[in-house]
Amino acid sequence: MNFDNKNKNDNYQESIQRIVNQRNNLLKEIENKINQQFGNGNYETLIKSIELIYEIEEKIKRIKELNSLQCDLLEYINPTNSMVPTSPFSSPNFPNSNIEIIDQKQHHQQKLQQQQQQQQQQQQQQQQQQQQQQQQQQQQKQQQKQQQQQLQQSHTKQSPKKQGHNSKQQFLTSLEKHKDQKEENEENEENEENEENEENEENKEKDVEVAKSNKPKRGRPSKPKPEYCFRYGTRSCPYWRKNVIKGELVDVCNACGLHLMKKEKKDLMEKQKNSIKNLLNNDEIITNYDDLGFVLYN
């Protein structure tokens, strides 16, 4: 276990050394860039060279990142005796410089302070708005009171007879309005109750119909009824079924047992038509009709 911890610490030390080397290289590059511009004491070129300023800012950002990494590694190795690195610009490689690097923790604290200040400002603004609203409400109340006082003064100026007469009329009109409003409310309530009752009844009927339609049917399903029995010309034998006779699908009456081929069916229908025509032409009294109006014949 001790051997493993030693290897880990060695690895962390190597990574810290690499970070320090990278930081020193960046500082040397910045120093060389500045020496190129300030070698002859030409300070105006530095102000004009925006690209150089951007390059230096990017390298300073990278140095800040390396500082934060170094802090994290040192705290991880020695959480109790963690050493925060000093500003890299205070090294002998970069003397006489006023540039300072702000630690990330300080930057975070500054952000928190800014947020708190913003919240306080918002709260103050809300309080001011509430105060303004309260003032407006008070002003409105005062105006209403003044209007009421003016109305009362105008009524007191009238004669006592007129005042009494007007007060009676106002009382009667208010009673009539109250009665009318009460009647309207009662009518509206009755109409609403009637509508609700009608809707409930309709819903009940619909529910009953749905229940009937969904109710499972017992026994065999009923066969479709034919138009009429070809023997009697009525619905006295309504239960027909299909059956194959002599290799042909024919209609068979379950009641009388009559089965008809296609040709026989046509012949019977023609006979029925002719018999009905003959009866009508002979002006005979026709008394035997079934529910569908077909003539009963022998």
From Swiss-Prot:
Residues 4-37 form a coiled coil. Residues 148-227 are annotated as: Disordered. Residues 183-202 have a biased composition (Acidic residues). Keywords: Coiled coil, Metal-binding, Zinc, Zinc-finger. It comes from the Eukaryota. GO terms for biological process: regulation of DNA-templated transcription. A zinc finger (GATA-type) spans 229-256. InterPro entries: Znf_GATA (IPR000679), Znf_NHR/GATA (IPR013088). Residues 203-212 have a biased composition (Basic and acidic residues). GO terms for molecular function: sequence-specific DNA binding; zinc ion binding. SUPFAM superfamilies: Glucocorticoid receptor-like (DNA-binding domain) (SSF57716). Residues 214-223 have a biased composition (Basic residues). Gene3D superfamilies: Erythroid Transcription Factor GATA-1, subunit A. This is Putative GATA zinc finger domain-containing protein 25. The lineage of its organism: Eukaryota, Amoebozoa, Evosea, Eumycetozoa, Dictyostelia. The gene is gtaY.
